[in-house]
Amino acid sequence: VGVLHSLSGTMAISETALKETALMTIADINSKGGVMGRPIEAVVVDPASNWPLFAEKARQLITQEKVVATFGCWTSVSRKSVLPVFKELNSILYYPVQYEGEELEKNVFYTGAAPNQQAIPATEYLMSKEGGGAKRFFLLGTDYVYPRTTNKILRAFLHSKGVTDKDIQETYTPFGHGDYQ
């Protein structure tokens, strides 16, 4: 199986843990005899937090390394960059983290929560008496697909609950930004 997570660059701090989890799980399965008596072999590549490189590395895993499935990506932009490769080569991607929804591909197993399963319930709680009865909201995120789409969904939800635009602020930072002074 392929393991397609950034081990260097901006996303390494998050994705390295996913790589380690995949390897730990594979080791556990292999310690119990593997799958149908055969051990699973992990092929790990580093797309280095470089979105176009994700597609190149996915193609390498499928065509050169002959993996039957790939566990990988964190950001929506990395997932979207590999989708054409998985579709073209009819291979499987297991996408392990939350995502913005609004996408359904037969070659992807989405294992994380969508906004209606995570952000909406959290916002409902914040608006409840138990959650503090919030009436004003600040939507923020990194400037890419997941935060923008999730915040669009949250804004529509807040409007449906009577919250007006004057009580909603929205801000995005560039990817890799670290100076919040």
Functional labels for PLM-detected ranges:
Residues 1, 20-42, 132, 159-166:
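Signal peptide-proximal N-terminal region
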Residues 1-17, 73-74, 136-142:
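Short beta-strand segments enriched in small/hydrophobic residues
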Residues 1-13, 86-87, 94-95, 100-101, ...:
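Glycine/serine-rich loop-strand microenvironments at binding/catalytic pocket rims
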Residues 3, 16, 80, 120, ...:
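Residues forming the Rossmann-fold NAD(P)(H) cofactor-binding site
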Residues 13-20, 32-102, 111, 172-180:
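Beta-alpha junction/loop-to-helix N-cap segments that form part of ligand/metal-binding clefts
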Residues 16-24, 117, 121:
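A general alpha-helical scaffold signature found inside nucleotide-binding enzyme cores
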Residues 56, 100, 107-181:
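Extracellular/periplasmic Venus flytrap/periplasmic-binding protein
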